From Swiss-Prot:
Annotated family: Belongs to the AKH/HRTH/RPCH family.
One term of GO molecular function: pigment binding
InterPro entries per record: Adipokinetic_hormone_CS
Record's GO cellular component terms: extracellular region
Protein's UniProt name: Red pigment-concentrating hormone
Amino acid sequence: QLNFSPGW
């Protein structure tokens, strides 16, 4: 499982 959360 891969999670990507951008800081913008």
